[in-house]
């Protein structure tokens, strides 16, 4: 059985993510994310791929927007759960990032998502709201939720993140000597 050519296509473009990341380490997390949100720095490729937007930023708080689309569907005809996980991971991680000083970064260590309602292209714009629960010297935690335009809760998530610090000057000297 031969398969017909697809009737739908999707293309996207992105900027060099390392150039933006290099600028990010020169400022605190909130200032960096504000430049991304304003368009002064390009968004990361995942945001371009999914069409995610940064709708709100405050210290310890990040809201991302997303328009569910047909190309995001799973085999049963609704938006794939990985899309919800991705936008939750993004808003919760960025909520943590808004609290970090210059040169600090984070990486997700765990992510838990509870799916409470389906998304489709008929859902309309959804927002993922991330809130910091704890930020320490090495670990951070946040929670997030995805709501539709009526405020209906579609998913809830929690995350743990490792906070990374810039290398110490004496550690860099040691690396250069060795």
Q: What role is predicted for each listed range?
A:
Residues 1-178:
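Terminal targeting signals and extreme-terminal segments of soluble enzymes
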């Amino acid at each position: 059985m031969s398969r017909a050519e697809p009737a739908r296509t999707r293309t996207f473009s992105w900027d060099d993510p390392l150039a933006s990341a290099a600028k990010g380490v020169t400022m605190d997390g909130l200032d960096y994310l504000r430049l991304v949100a304003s368009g002064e720095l390009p968004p990361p490729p995942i945001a371009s791929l999914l069409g995610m937007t940064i709708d709100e930023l405050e210290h310890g708080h990040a809201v991302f927007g997303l328009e569910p689309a047909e190309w995001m569907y799973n085999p049963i005809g609704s938006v794939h759960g990985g899309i919800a996980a991705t936008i939750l991971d993004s808003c919760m991680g960025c909520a943590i990032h808004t609290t970090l000083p210059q040169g600090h970064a984070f990486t997700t260590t765990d992510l838990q998502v509870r799916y409470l309602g389906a998304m489709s292209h008929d859902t309309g714009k959804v927002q993922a709201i991330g809130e910091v629960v704890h930020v320490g010297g090495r670990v951070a935690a946040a929670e997030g939720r995805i709501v539709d335009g009526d405020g209906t809760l579609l998913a809830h998530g929690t995350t743990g993140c490792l906070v990374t610090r810039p290398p110490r000057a004496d550690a860099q000297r040691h690396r250069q000597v060795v």
